[in-house]
């Protein structure tokens, strides 16, 4: 499956839907979606990872990038995180900087 990062907005929330594998080759596309989400001025960023099948270290760095790019008062929620992806996020210790809802 090809990687897809799709941004939608509404009601003060920017949602980025991720599908496929988030790795070094695809992280720049996710960075672009994060920049676009920040530009909306949304008070909440939702990252829908329900179709994300794999996350590499570059994907983890992209999550850190997201946390650094948004304002401190913006909530970032990871929703629909699959067990394999959640395991990697937890092993990296990134589960404390985000509101995470597993699938």
Label every model-predicted segment.
Residues 1-17:
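Short beta-strand/loop segment at the start of cytosolic alpha/beta domains
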Residues 24-97:
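Amphipathic alpha-helical interaction surfaces in cytosolic regulatory modules
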Residues 99-103:
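Short acidic-hydrophobic, aromatic-tinged amphipathic segments that line or gate anion-handling sites
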């Amino acid at each position: 499956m090809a990687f897809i990062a799709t941004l939608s907005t509404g009601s003060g929330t920017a949602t980025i839907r991720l599908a496929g594998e988030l790795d070094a080759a695809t992280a720049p596309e996710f960075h672009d979606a994060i920049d676009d989400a920040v530009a909306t001025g949304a008070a909440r960023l939702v990252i829908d990872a329900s179709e994300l099948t794999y996350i590499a270290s570059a994907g983890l760095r992209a999550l850190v990038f997201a946390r650094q790019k948004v304002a401190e008062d913006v909530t970032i929620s990871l929703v629909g995180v699959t067990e394999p992806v959640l395991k990697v996020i937890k092993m990296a210790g990134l589960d404390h900087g985000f509101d995470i809802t597993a699938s």
